[in-house]
Amino acid sequence: MKKVVHVVGARPNFMKAAPVLRALDRLPIGQSLVHTGQHYDAQMSEVFFRQLGLPEPDYNLAVGSDSHARQTGLAMQKLEPVLAEARPDLVLVYGDVNSTLAASLVCAKLVIPLGHVEAGLRSFDRSMPEEVNRVVTDRLSDLLFTPSADADENLRAEGVKDSCIHRVGNVMIDSLVRLLPGTEERSIWHDYALVTLHRPSNVDDPEVLGRLAGALTEMSRVIPVVFPVHPRTRARLEAVSGVCRAENLCLLPPA
């Protein structure tokens, strides 16, 4: 029986991996799930596993939070013995987080075939850590599963052979369709704005965050604003006076 190992580490990975795991469950394929623990808070990890119907990870590497280099390096260090022992026929990685890059590098060193789900996306901004992760992961991947025609073209422009490119669509839509009926049961305002804010370039600079907080407060005077807050963002917001007290600005846990 062929063996596939899925490596995930953060919220964006979970919602992409869930439909792939379910689809492969219908085939005679052995599957293992490795969670690096890049996102480790219960509201950032466990609740997503429950809501998405993901199985308990076979391995939780408890990498935790650190700088990009340290986090990636520790994930590689902990992934290597797991993949060396498992020797799967394919490792699947998702998106562009540090865990994705770490698994890609380990697979390259161990000569294990690698597939990248959500390959080919580009911002063309190398100041973004995710862009570096995407480009390197795609260069190391044997199978590139793309969400769109522009992703295909990006890979071709970088010299990737057509035989390696497989357009499968946006797998997050599968998760959306599966969870959408449950949203209709929620009691919430009829019209509202949904906000997400977590990029370091937005939340680590007090001046930038202050302007954004002011804009959210102004927006909440026009339409109710629902804001699922990343723990790191919440800590930064606590230093910004007034944003948490706006009447129609609803700060929620990230799940």
Question: PLM ranges: what are they?
Answer:
Residues 4-14, 198-207:
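Short, glycine-rich nucleotide/cofactor-binding loops
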Residues 30-39:
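A short beta-strand-loop structural module common to alpha/beta enzyme folds
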